[in-house]
A protein has these predicted regions:
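Carbohydrate-associated surface elements
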Residues: 173, 193
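Short hydrophobic beta-strand element within catalytic cores of glycosyltransferases
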Residues: 300, 309-312
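Conserved acidic donor-binding segment of nucleotide-sugar-dependent glycosyltransferases
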Residues: 324-325, 329-335, 344-349
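Short acidic/histidine- and often glycine-rich active-site loop of Leloir-type glycosyltransferases
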Residues: 137, 315-325, 329-330
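Conserved donor-binding/catalytic core segment of Leloir-type glycosyltransferases
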Residues: 168, 194, 201-229, 242
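Aromatic "clamp/platform" in nucleotide-sugar-dependent glycosyltransferases that forms part
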Residues: 292
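Membrane-proximal helix-turn-helix segments that form the acceptor-binding/catalytic region
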Residues: 134, 146-167
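Nucleotide-activated donor-binding/catalytic signature segment of Leloir-type glycosyltransferases, i.e.
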Residues: 254-272
Length: 477
């Protein structure tokens, strides 16, 4: 029997195979926590889809004053115990008492791991979910002794406890940082989803406008953006910056804007509900990022959904989210940022060029759906389960290969594709993204099942992120 395929990008259908399974998610916060952010939203969106597919998902997370000890959100059971650090000890107790009742554990690491394999039977699949590596943040935010402890736990301690257990990273940049730390097990890329791409956008503001959605915290380096905005404002009359978001840096940044003579240029809106935020984004010419590093540029992709390109520094996470020359522009140093911002705004002043770039931004954003993210992470869980059962070897490398061949497929592909692979059929052609395989390994597997008329190429960063069914990624590589 041939392998079933749907038009467009799809992982090998995985969520249905989680039906009936008890899955435990360990996270230090849930989405109702006052400091919840993108990491919590990521796992919540995926968990809700797993529940819809028939899985039974329980979160064990930290407790904040005013929160109940147990809750149900979107079909997800939430258990809360312990504070910011106490949650780790409480999670260990929970795993020792009831861990054997679960079919799989997703261990969300936010700098400090839960070390769940130490408290679970070996047979239970554990997938560590990592958004970004915190080694530099430990150095910059904590005293030397505390920073040393944090770096040890995230690096040496985690490698010792998790060993060859699977990791899901949200971007190629995060995977690269993990490899630099010496993690040698399989690291799968599972990008974030984003908002639904609107059918129509605009009209754009008649004046050159930059819209930024960001928490106002130190590592976002909004002060750098303000400094470079002062440079750009000399060349761009009536330039505007709309800042949406709040945080401990707000008062300092407002004073800096005053000191730079930008009071008439910059508006700090604070936190904005979705409707107001979207209205401001849809009118923007560009968005901007001067962050030191990210796991993934969530706000960059949200802006792209509204057809807004990004001017950014080439840093981890952001360089994955911006396709240079198509959905934005990247520079290597802060000194280059101001002049490049001027060039970007001048480009967007051309209506024809602006329409072209806006269309490419939206095409890129359409690649990132929460349904696909949920399928991909389910695939990582299933692949780890097969590995522990001895039915499948771990991915041997971080390489990925795109294979194209004519449809329909007479061969049974089920013996050669893995749960983490993706397959699509469009216009009489099958596109298969095989992960952990180079071109020679991929061809050998397909030859084994009689698929010989193939075209193979290494899959680049954009292809890996967007999936094989995306014409955008096929062109971008």
């Amino acid at each position: 029997m041939g392998h079933a395929m749907n038009a467009g990008t799809s992982p090998i259908a995985n969520m249905g195979r989680l039906a009936g399974k008890q899955i435990l998610v360990l996270n230090w916060r849930d989405i109702k926590h006052s400091q919840a952010g993108g990491a919590e939203q990521y796992m919540h969106q995926i968990s809700a889809r797993w529940v819809e597919a028939g899985a039974k998902v329980t979160w064990f997370t930290g407790h904040q004053p005013g929160q109940s000890a147990e809750d149900f959100l979107d079909g997800i059971r939430i258990l809360r115990s312990g504070g910011t650090l106490g949650v780790y000890a409480q999670a260990a107790r929970k795993l020792l008492q009831t861990g054997s009742l679960y079919d799989a554990v997703v261990d969300c690491q936010n700098g400090i791991p839960f070390f769940s394999p130490a408290f679970l039977p070996r047979r239970i699949p554990v997938v560590q979910l990592i958004h970004h590596v915190h080694q530099e943040q430990f150095r910059s935010r904590f005293s030397a002794p505390m920073a040393a402890v944090g770096r040890f736990l995230e690096n040496t301690g985690a490698k010792a406890v998790y060993g060859q257990r699977a990791i899901a990273a949200v971007s190629p940049s995060t995977r690269l940082e993990l490899r630099k730390l010496g993690f040698r097990g399989p690291v799968h890329v599972v990008p974030n989803g984003t908002i639904e791409v609107p059918q129509t956008v605009g009209p754009r503001d008649p004046e050159p406008t930059i819209a930024v959605v960001s928490r106002l915290v130190r590592h976002k380096r909004m002060d750098l953006l303000l400094g470079q905005l002062a440079v750009a404002a000399r060349s761009i009359p009536r330039l505007r910056l709309e800042v949406m978001g709040d945080g401990p840096e707000r008062a300092r940044l407002q004073q800096l804007a005053t000191d730079l003579g930008l009071d008439d240029t910059v508006t700090f809106h604070g936190y904005q509900p979705n409707a107001q935020r979207n209205a401001l984004l849809s009118r923007a010419w560009v968005t901007a990022s001067t962050s030191a590093a990210e796991g993934w540029g969530c706000s960059v992709i949200e802006a792209a959904a509204w057809g807004v390109p990004c001017m950014a520094l080439r840093v981890p996470g952001i360089r994955d989210s911006v396709v240079e020359g198509r959905t934005g522009w990247l520079v290597d140093t802060a000194r280059e940022f101001g002049p490049a911002l001027v060039t970007a705004l001048e480009t967007m002043a051309n209506p024809n060029k602006a329409r072209e770039i806006s269309a490419q931004c939206q095409q890129w954003a359409r690649c990132f759906t929460w349904d696909r993210s949920a399928e991909l992470l389910a695939g990582v869980v299933l692949e780890e389960e097969l590995r522990l059962q001895g039915a499948e070897e771990a991915a041997s490398s971080d390489m990925a290969t795109l294979i194209r061949f004519p449809a329909p497929v007479a061969a049974d592909l089920s013996s050669v594709v893995r749960p983490t692979d993706e397959i699509a059929e469009n216009n009489g052609e099958v596109s298969l993204l095989m992960k952990g395989k180079d071109e020679f390994e991929a061809f050998a597997l397909l030859k084994r099942v009689g698929v010989l008329n193939v075209q193979l190429r290494p899959a680049g960063r954009s292809m890996l992120l967007a999936g094989p069914g995306s014409a955008f990624a096929a062109e971008a590589g």
